[in-house]
Amino acid sequence: MILQTGQRTDIPAFYGQWLINRIREGFVDVRNPYNPLQVTRYPINQEVVDGIAFCTKNPLPFIPLLNEIVDYRQYWHMTITPYGTDIEPYVPTYASVIEGFKHISKQLNSQSMVWRYDPIILTNEYTVDFHCESFYKMAQALKGYTDTVVVSFLDIFDKVVQNFPEGYRPSLDIQTKIIKEFVSIAHSNHMNLKTCGEGVIFKELGADTEGCLTLDCYESAWNIKLKAPKRAPARPECNCYLHGDIGAYDSCSHFCRYCYANTNRAVVRYNRLHHDPNSSLLIGRLSKREIIKESTEKSWIINETVTQDSLF
């Protein structure tokens, strides 16, 4: 199985030691977000976990812990955007995140690193020209450290409406203009540009619309073949294989205004007060009321050819 860590929160930024403790203990407990008393227990060992998928805005706190997971294949999605504190209040400067990206890429390989420039948000300050210039500078800085960049436009989920009411999706004409320019920049820096959750409308512009976190992504990065259980897509326009996430909603303190995973800051702060690095759960501890279901996951590898390089 692939251990997912980034659909609900940012574990490398805020909960790295907790993850390392779970790996040392050999299992992790995950609450069902819709039924908190229902808990799934996933084993964490190399016989079952084929790799760990990360999605983060700030890898820097986790870098000192990377030696602890050197024996696991890794696949990183790292969001690097040019927004200020008006939109991303507690995300480090993009220059520092780029350095973190490069550091990890050097230890793994460029195929295991994905740069996310999303969501694309337009305001009076963050104009089309601003985005094109920012994307160009970042692409040049990341050239050779990744072969993939993922982009998308703002999705208007309920929590986004609540926390970012002025957010909107630009017209299709403007989206097309941006994607066309981004594809050109990406290709000139030896990157494949993928769209996330945008359907196939940008395929004719040269964008890869086949999904940004598919089994093919893992297979290409890790030089293996996988056979995974069939899963329904998270939404109709998404081809990604999302499974086994160990995070929890309402626990990310980046407080990005466009976030779909946080209700509000008060809930996040309350939950973080109940985080224990030694707990089997990300938030809180087990009581006697939970029903624990042991996961029956197994390795998905059917033909391993080459293991992921590591220079640790």
Spans of features found by a protein language model:
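Local cysteine-cluster metal-coordination motifs and their immediate loop/turn environment
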Residues: 236, 244-264
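A conserved mid-domain beta-alpha-beta active-site/ligand-binding segment of alpha/beta enzyme cores
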Residues: 160-165, 169-244
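Conserved Radical SAM active-site core
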Residues: 1-87, 94-97, 101-110, 265-312
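Surface-exposed cleft-lining segments at the edges of enzyme active sites
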Residues: 83-91, 119-129, 163-171
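Active-site beta-loop-alpha junctions enriched in small/polar residues
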Residues: 8-10, 57, 79-83, 118-122, ...
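Conserved C-terminal portion of the radical SAM core fold
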Residues: 96-162, 180-197
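A generic local structural motif
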Residues: 38-41, 136, 244
